[in-house]
C-alpha cells in the first residue's frame, strides 16, 4: 500500500513539474483556497487561534489572514518538490543580514539557528551559504515518501536530516565537532519549557536554547516571508545574547521565553505568513471538548 501511495505521489509530482513555475504557484493558491474551504478542522483551528492572538481584529480581517496563511503553506509545500532549482535562481531569494550567519560561523563553535513555521519555511536555510546544515524532522509514515523527501532536502540545502525520536539529542550533540549550522524549528508546541505565547500559557521546544547554552554556540533567529511574486525574503537577526546564570534550568526557561517573545513580534508583523492551522495552544481540542453549545454555534458556519 505504501509503495502504491508513493507511485501516485511521484506521478502527481511528475505532472506538476511539467508546468511552468508560475502556474505551479497558481495551482498552490488554488489548493490553498480549496483546503481552507474543505478541511473544516484546520480552518476552525486557524480562525480560533487568530481570534485568540488578535482579539482587536474583525472577523473579516481574521478570515483574510487565515486564507492567506493556507495559500502560503500549500505553496511552500509544493515548492519543496523543486527546491533545488528554486533556490538556485538568484532572483527568487533576498537575504537580509546574511553576514550575521558568517560572523557567527567564524567563531568556530558551530551555529544554532532557530527557525519558524512561516513563509517558505525551509527556504530560510539558503542563508547558510555553502555551510553544511543539520536539522530534525519527523519521520513520515510512508518510508518511500520519507526517503524521497529526505533526498530532496539534502540536494537543495546541503542538509543532513536527523529523525526525531528519543535519541535525537544525543545524535545532535555527537555532531557538534563537525561545526555545522543547526537549524531547528522552535515555534510549535513540543516538550520543553512552559511559556506565555500570545497571552496564553503553552509549551515550547527548548532543544535549540539548551544546546546553545550548554555548548556556547552563537544563537540567531532565521525566518522568511513568501512574497506575492513568489520570491522570498530571508531575515537573519543579530546574534541573540542568551542570559546566563548559575542555574541552567532557569536559564533555559528564561531564554526560551525570550525567544518566544521575539518570534511573537515577528508573527505580529507578518501574521499571514505563519502556520495558524496547527493546534499550537490546544485551542481546537478545547473547543471540541469544553465550549458550551451556544459558543459552538458561533463558529459552526466558519
Can you name each region flagged by the protein language model?
Residues 1-115, 146-148:
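Membrane-anchoring hydrophobic helices of lipid-metabolizing enzymes
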Residues 7, 42, 93, 164, ...:
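Soluble or luminal CAZymes and related metallo-dependent hydrolases
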Residues 11, 46, 148-149, 157, ...:
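Hydrophobic alpha-helical segments typical of transmembrane helices
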Residues 64-67, 106, 130, 134, ...:
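Non-catalytic C-terminal accessory region of glycerolipid acyltransferases
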Residues 87-93, 112, 138, 158-163, ...:
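Short, flexible loop segments at the rims of nucleotide/cofactor-binding pockets, characterized by
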Residues 95, 161, 219-221:
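Conserved beta-strand scaffold positions in the cores of enzyme catalytic domains, especially
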Residues 107-166, 190-193:
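Catalytic core of membrane glycerolipid acyltransferases/transacylases, capturing the structured
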Amino acid at each position: 500500500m505504501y509503495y502504491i501511495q508513493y507511485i501516485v505521489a511521484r506521478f502527481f509530482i511528475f505532472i506538476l513539474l511539467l508546468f511552468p513555475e508560475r502556474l505551479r504557484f497558481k495551482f498552490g493558491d488554488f489548493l490553498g483556497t480549496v483546503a481552507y474551504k474543505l478541511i473544516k478542522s484546520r480552518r476552525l483551528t486557524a480562525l480560533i487561534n487568530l481570534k485568540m492572538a488578535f482579539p482587536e481584529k474583525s472577523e473579516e480581517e481574521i478570515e483574510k489572514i487565515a486564507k492567506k496563511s493556507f495559500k502560503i503553506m500549500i505553496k511552500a509545500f509544493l515548492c519543496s518538490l523543486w527546491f533545488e532549482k528554486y533556490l538556485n535562481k538568484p532572483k527568487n531569494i533576498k537575504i537580509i543580514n546574511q553576514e550575521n550567519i558568517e560572523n557567527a560561523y567564524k567563531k568556530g563553535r558551530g551555529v544554532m539557528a532557530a527557525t519558524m513555521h512561516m513563509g517558505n519555511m525551509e527556504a530560510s536555510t539558503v542563508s547558510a551559504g555553502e555551510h553544511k546544515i543539520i536539522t530534525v524532522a519527523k519521520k513520515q509514515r510512508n518510508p518511500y515518501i520519507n526517503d524521497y523527501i529526505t533526498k530532496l532536502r539534502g540536494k537543495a540545502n546541503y542538509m543532513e536530516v536527523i529523525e526525531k525520536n528519543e535519541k535525537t539529542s544525543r545524535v545532535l550533540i555527537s555532531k557538534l565537532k563537525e561545526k555545522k549550522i543547526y537549524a531547528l524549528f522552535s515555534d510549535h508546541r513540543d516538550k520543553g519549557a512552559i511559556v506565555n505565547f500570545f497571552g496564553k500559557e503553552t509549551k515550547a521546544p527548548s532543544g535549540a536554547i539548551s544546546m546553545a547554552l550548554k555548548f556556547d554556540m552563537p544563537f540567531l533567529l532565521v525566518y522568511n516571508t513568501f512574497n506575492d511574486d513568489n520570491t522570498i525574503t530571508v531575515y537573519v537577526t543579530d546574534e541573540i545574547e542568551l542570559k546566563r546564570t548559575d542555574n541552567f534550568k532557569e536559564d533555559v526557561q528564561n531564554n526560551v521565553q525570550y525567544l518566544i517573545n521575539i518570534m511573537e513580534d515577528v508573527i505580529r508583523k507578518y501574521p499571514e505568513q505563519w502556520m495558524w492551522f496547527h493546534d499550537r495552544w490546544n485551542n481546537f481540542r478545547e473547543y471540541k471538548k469544553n465550549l458550551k453549545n451556544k459558543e459552538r454555534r458561533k463558529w459552526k458556519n466558519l
